[in-house]
Regions:
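Flavin (FAD/FMN)-binding glycine-rich loop and adjacent Rossmann-like elements that form
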Residues: 1-4, 9, 13-14, 18-25, ...
Length: 261
């Protein structure tokens, strides 16, 4: 729902039918930038590997060395119990906005997992293994990236750069092995031209090398916290999200337990 250049709400479909939900500030936490794209904000689209994760049970009774010798290299890792392994099977780079392709891959990946488990169970060392759980839906890693008022770059992130509008310190994709945490600027969450909308999650304005780090769940949570706080301040101070008082926002986040460096 638009009024001139400002987002005033969203239209949804539910069991109650079609409804409009209006707000003074809208936070797009869809992960795919669904709201800012529909509103006409500048953005780019990326392709990335999709996948379907699953868990294997009775792993502690299996002979993993025999299974790996037989060619099953990806047997996941123990999580949360020694008897349970979490396995991540990556698929091809895919348009995560193509619902027909996602539906096809959903079926393909589930069949592939069942087939793989059957093969494991008929291989020496894997007789006791069973499929404990599959993810509720196929995992999409990245789709749209917002064009914000500030772009995050890997060069800045790896240098330990602090932005004037830092709203969080994110973690790294490799678990910190050789890569430090990095500051996230508020400007990466705010559209260049669109008003009354803030983006949160993996769809912020970052360069290609930063995509893997920004899509981590913990980092997405941090940006969601900042987006909610900024939206509340914008409403309270009767200003546009791009005009939020940054020191006031940072002070609010710190009072709520956020670490900003």
């Amino acid at each position: 729902v638009m009024e001139n250049n400002a987002v005033r709400g969203v239209v949804i479909e539910s069991k109650a039918g079609r409804q409009a939900i209006l707000a003074k500030v809208v936070v797009d936490a869809s992960g795919d930038g669904d709201v800012f794209a529909a509103a006409g904000a500048e953005h780019e689209q990326r392709l990335h590997a999709v996948g379907l994760v699953h868990r294997l049970g009775d792993v502690d009774r299996a002979d993993l060395a025999k299974l790996q010798a037989a060619g099953f290299q990806n047997l996941g890792g123990a999580e949360p119990l020694p008897s349970v392994h979490w396995v991540n099977l990556r698929g091809p780079s895919t348009d995560g906005l193509d619902i027909a392709e996602l539906s096809r891959l959903e079926v393909e990946h589930r069949r592939s997992i069942w087939k793989r488990v059957e093969q494991l169970r008929t291989t020496a060392g894997g007789e006791t293994l069973f499929l404990l759980q599959t993810a509720p839906q196929i995992g999409v890693r990245i789709t749209r990236l917002l064009a914000g008022t500030r772009k995050m770059t890997e060069a800045e992130a790896r240098s330990g750069n602090q932005y004037p509008d830092t709203i969080a310190i994110g973690g790294t994709y490799d678990g910190g092995r050789g890569k430090p945490g990095f500051a996230i600027p508020y400007g990466a969450m705010v559209p260049r031209k669109l008003d009354q909308l803030i983006a949160a999650g993996r769809c912020l304005d970052v360069d290609s090398p930063m995509v893997e780090d920004m899509r981590l769940i913990a980092t997405c949570l941090l940006t969601g916290h900042a987006a909610g706080a900024a939206a509340a301040l914008a409403v309270k101070d009767r200003c546009r999200p791009r005009d939020v008082d940054i020191p006031k926002l940072q002070a609010l986040l710190r009072r709520q337990g956020a670490y900003l460096g």
